[in-house]
Every structure is written in structure tokens, then in C-alpha cells.
């Protein structure tokens, strides 16, 4: 059997004309630190709730972790206070001059469920509670709430705009459990996103116009601080 010879010079010249390493944009998605309402089991939605003592410690811990990694070119945040407070801590440690607020990164509006305790949602607002856990993605939650599709559309649009502005760069985005769940499900087309933990690190890459999950729900930096094991789970009723 004869050998197949390769023209090495031709092969080398061809490879020079091809970009072997695709440009990768890295977005580090962070869920805000624990709040008073998280700890109490209350449904926040778009209602403001402050970071509690544990949440403040979590913000410090995640800021210290990210400060030791590759420096981001920018820090973005939801315009809700719990996310902004977490983002400000990260920005300071990562030597970023400001936190850029993006309203479309805010938590899902969950209608008449907002302000209730999870344990009373099914009894006090059965229609809204059912809509929240429904697999019908275009179903809006009664009381002015958003459908899953509305949440996912604005969340992914915000992510796309950030990635477009920072091609080939690394940025940090601080947001919410519902937004993280929507992003995960849109990217993976999975049926469940599992638990979204406070102050978790979730990394996504955009390469060749395709989103890829690099790592998800990493809380290794919280070993000495602790976190709510139940997290946020929009797929399972409490």
C-alpha cells in the first residue's frame, strides 16, 4: 500500500490563513448573596430585600475569590439592591470603577405571589402558584407577573448585548435565581436547572455564536461562610 504524502509547506501556509482558536467571551454569572427574605422563605420577585449578615459575608467571599482570578473588564448587575450590593463588593475587589446596571437582569415579576411565604403560596394564590410552576412557558402569572418566556427573552437579550460589547473578554454579571434558571434552560434546552444557590459562580462562554455552560452552581468559596441548601428551585414545589 502506498503512502499518502502531505505537502508540508502548503499545509503550513493554509493553517496561517485559518484562525485556529475561536474568540471566546466569558461571562461569570453570580447570584446575589442571601437576603432576609431568602432566609425567611418569602417570595421576593421584584420586591427589594436587603442582604442579611450571611449574605454580606457571602458577598465578601465571592469578591475575594473573583479578585484572585483573571481580572474582568466590567461588572454588570440587576438594578435591584440585593444584586447591586453584591456587585459593588465584587467590583471593588476586582478594581472595576463602576457597576453597570441592566434592568433586564432583574428577577422575574411573579405577580400576586410577591411578598408571600412559599409555604402559603398554594393556599392564598393557587392560580398564581400553579402558573409559576407550569410547564406552559407562555403563561403569565396573575397579578402582573411575567411568563417564563418573557423572563427568558429579556434575560438572554441582556446577555447577548453584554457579550456583543465585550467580544473575547471576561465580564461579571450579578443577577437572580430566576434569571439564572432561565438562562440555563435556554442554553441547554434541559427540563430542569436544579438548585440556584446564593453567591454561586456560574460560568458561560460564547464561542462562534454558540452559548456553552462552562461550570454551574459553584459555591466552593463559601465553605467557611455557609449557604441555604434549598437555594432557588423553580422546578420543584417547596
Curated annotation (Swiss-Prot):
Q: Which GO terms describe its molecular function?
A: L-phosphoserine phosphatase activity
> Reaction(s) catalyzed by this protein?
O-phospho-L-serine + H2O = L-serine + phosphate; O-phospho-D-serine + H2O = D-serine + phosphate
Write out the entry's keywords from A to Z.
Answer: Hydrolase
Tell me which PROSITE patterns the record gives: PG_MUTASE
First and last residue of the signal peptide? none
Sites marked Transition state stabilizer: 176
Q: Which InterPro entries match?
A: His_Pase_superF_clade-1, His_PPase_superfam, PG/BPGM_mutase_AS, PGM_Phosphatase
Which residues does the entry assign to the active site, renumbered to this chain? 32 (tele-phosphohistidine intermediate), 107 (proton donor/acceptor)
Enzymatic class: hydrolase
GO BP field: D-serine biosynthetic process; L-serine biosynthetic process
EC number of the protein: 3.1.3.3
Q: Which CDD domains match?
A: HP_PGM_like (cd07067)
Q: Can you tell me which family this protein belongs to?
A: Belongs to the phosphoglycerate mutase family.
Q: What function does the entry list?
A: Phosphoglycerate mutase-like protein lacking PGM activity, but having a low metal-independent phosphoserine phosphatase activity in vitro. May be involved in serine biosynthesis.
PANTHER family, alphabetically? BROAD-SPECIFICITY PHOSPHATASE YOR283W-RELATED, PHOSPHATASE C1620.13-RELATED
UniProt name for this protein: Metal-independent phosphoserine phosphatase
Origin species: Arabidopsis thaliana (Mouse-ear cress)
Source lineage: Eukaryota, Viridiplantae, Streptophyta, Embryophyta, Tracheophyta
Gene from which the chain derives = IPSP
Amino acid at each position: 500500500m502506498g503512502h499518502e504524502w502531505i505537502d508540508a509547506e502548503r499545509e503550513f501556509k493554509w493553517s496561517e490563513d485559518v484562525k485556529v482558536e475561536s474568540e471566546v467571551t466569558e461571562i461569570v454569572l453570580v447570584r446575589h448573596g442571601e437576603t432576609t427574605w431568602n432566609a425567611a422563605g418569602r417570595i421576593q420577585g421584584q420586591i427589594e430585600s436587603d442582604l442579611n449578615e450571611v449574605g454580606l459575608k457571602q458577598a465578601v467571599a465571592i469578591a475575594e475569590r473573583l479578585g484572585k482570578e483573571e481580572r474582568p473588564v466590567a461588572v454588570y448587575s440587576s438594578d435591584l439592591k440585593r444584586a447591586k450590593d453584591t456587585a459593588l463588593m465584587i467590583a471593588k475587589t476586582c478594581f472595576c470603577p463602576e457597576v453597570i446596571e441592566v434592568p433586564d437582569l432583574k428577577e422575574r415579576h411573579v405577580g400576586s405571589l410577591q411578598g408571600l411565604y412559599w409555604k402559603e403560596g398554594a393556599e392564598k394564590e393557587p392560580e398564581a402558584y400553579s402558573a409559576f410552576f407550569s410547564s406552559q412557558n407562555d403563561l403569565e402569572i396573575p397579578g402582573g407577573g411575567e411568563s417564563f418566556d418573557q423572563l427568558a427573552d429579556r434575560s438572554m437579550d441582556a446577555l447577548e448585548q453584554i457579550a456583543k460589547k465585550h467580544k473575547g473578554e471576561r465580564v461579571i454579571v450579578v443577577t437572580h435565581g430566576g434569571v439564572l434558571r432561565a438562562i440555563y434552560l435556554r442554553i441547554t434546552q434541559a427540563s430542569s436547572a436544579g438548585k440556584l444557590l446564593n453567591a454561586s459562580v456560574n460560568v458561560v462562554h460564547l464561542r462562534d455564536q454558540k452559548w456553552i455552560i462552562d461550570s454551574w452552581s459553584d459555591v466552593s468559596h463559601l465553605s467557611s461562610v455557609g449557604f441555604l441548601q434549598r437555594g432557588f428551585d423553580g422546578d420543584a414545589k417547596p
